[in-house]
Amino acid sequence: MTHFDFHVHTALSACADNLLSPGRIVRKARETGVDFVAVTDHNASAHAAVAVRLAADCGLHILPGMEVNSREEVHLLALFSELEALEDFQALIDSVLPVGENPTGFFGPQVIYDERDEIVAMDERMRQMGVSLGLDVLVEEIRGRGGYAVPAHVYRSRNSLTSQLGFVPEAAGYAALDFAARTWRSEGLAAGQRVHGYPATTGSDSHFLEDVGRHFCTISRSVGTVHELFGALAEVAP
C-alpha cells in the first residue's frame, strides 16, 4: 500500500502559512505515514531541493514540483522525478512570469527556509499571477522534461479547468486529475478511477502545517518511484 499527496504548499507560496518550512513538512508527513509528498508552490520551487535533502534519510519520497498558473488562470501541478528537470522548468517559468515585485501587503510574503527551519531569504518576484504560456503549452513543456501534468482541484469554482474553460479537455496529455478533498469525499472517488478519461487523484492542498497528512490518496500497491506510482494509477480499471 502507498499513501501519497501530490499537492503541498510551503511558506514560499504567498498564500501559505509563513511557518510552513520544508523541514516541518517532512517531519509532519512522516508522522502521518505518507510515503510520497509533492512540494508544489505557486510558480516557484526553491524549497524542493531542501525537502529532497531532508527526506533522503527518513524513507519519505519527495516529488519536486510546482503549481503553475497558466495564461488562462488554470492551476496545473507539474511533478517531476528529478530536481534538474524541475530547475529547468523553473527557468522557463521565470522567463514568462509577469513583470513586477510581489505585493507583500496584498498577497503575503514568499519565505525561503533552509534545512534548519531558519529563514534565509524572501522571494520578491510576483508569483501568484498567471504566466504568459497557455495550458496546452505548459503541458507539453512538463511532459518534454519527463514530468507529469495534473490539473489541480478540477471542479473548484476558481483557477480550475471547469471554472476557466468550462470543460475538461479530452486527450490533452494530463497524467491525472486532482480533486479537492471535499469533492473527493462527496463524489465517492477512488485513486485511479477514470473521470473524464483520466485517473483521479486527490491531495491536501496544504497551506498550514496541520493540513499536512490530513488528506491524501492511497493505492493498494507498494511502489518506490514516481514513475511506478503513475503507472499504478494508470493501470486501475476504468
Tell where the protein language model's regions lie, with residue ranges.
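Charged catalytic cores and adjacent phosphate/nucleic-acid-binding surfaces used
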Residues: 1-6, 10-34, 45-91, 110, ...
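Conserved Rossmann-like nucleotide-binding pocket used by diverse enzymes
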Residues: 38
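Short, cationic low-complexity segments
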Residues: 94-109
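Short, basic/glycine-rich phosphate-binding loops at helix/coil junctions
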Residues: 107-121
